[in-house]
């Protein structure tokens, strides 16, 4: 199959939406192919069920224009550095051949988010090694970036989502079981104005870069600009 332009990994369905739903909506609108891979079924979530979370994830994907969404059904709160997990992620990377890969940032209050980042980084490296899992052809990812979930970190670069912030909110609100308390739900950090907090963060990043709303990202290596510093073409 032809490769994806972007493949975003999350520990749980809704992680990717929190960090970069606006960016995904922006690029799918421009015709780029974007995929999402959730590592767990979030079966230990305080609210919702596995079946409901899957339906919510499908709805959010439709809102963002994502046609490819996978779930590897790894254990919730069990994302440790295991070879079997790395191999599963390598298979996904080699199958979908993404140009860019995104994962959560390492610094996050939820250990699964940080461990997801580490597993994906290991898998990206191994995916490019020809003799590692030789039954599947290798694939080298061009760039690896991190999005934010619970943190307010200083980003290395931002993407303008001013025209897509409403889609981001809509994608997040698709996870009704997580961001609102139903009759049988319990209060969690996600149900107490979490979506509003995320939007406020993107507004703050937007203000810092001179737009209405922006999503912030981190990169281990320098990012090459595709426009010069005074706004012209490279």
Curated annotation (Swiss-Prot):
GO BP terms: bacillithiol biosynthetic process
Catalytic activity line of the entry: (S)-malyl N-acetyl-alpha-D-glucosaminide + H2O = (S)-malyl alpha-D-glucosaminide + acetate
Enzyme Commission designation: 3.5.1.-
EC primary class: hydrolase
Domain of life of the source: Bacteria
Effect of residue 110 to A: 4-fold decrease in activity
Regulation: Inhibited by BSH.
Swiss-Prot/TrEMBL cofactor(s): Zn(2+)
Keyword Disulfide bond set for record: no
Record text on cofactor binding: Can also use Ni(2+), Co(2+) and Fe(3+).
Effect of loss of the gene: Deletion reduces bacillithiol levels by 30%.
Amino acids binding Zn(2+): 12, 15, 113
Keyword Nucleotide-binding part of the UniProt annotation: no
GO molecular function: deacetylase activity; hydrolase activity, acting on carbon-nitrogen (but not peptide) bonds, in linear amides; metal ion binding
Keyword line: Hydrolase, Metal-binding, Zinc
Protein family (similarity comment): Belongs to the PIGL family.
Function: Involved in bacillithiol (BSH) biosynthesis. Catalyzes the second step of the pathway, the deacetylation of N-acetylglucosaminylmalate (GlcNAc-Mal) to glucosamine malate (GlcN-Mal).
The protein's name: N-acetyl-alpha-D-glucosaminyl L-malate deacetylase 1
Species of origin: Bacillus anthracis
Taxonomic lineage of the native organism: Bacteria, Bacillati, Bacillota, Bacilli, Bacillales
Gene from which the chain derives: bshB1
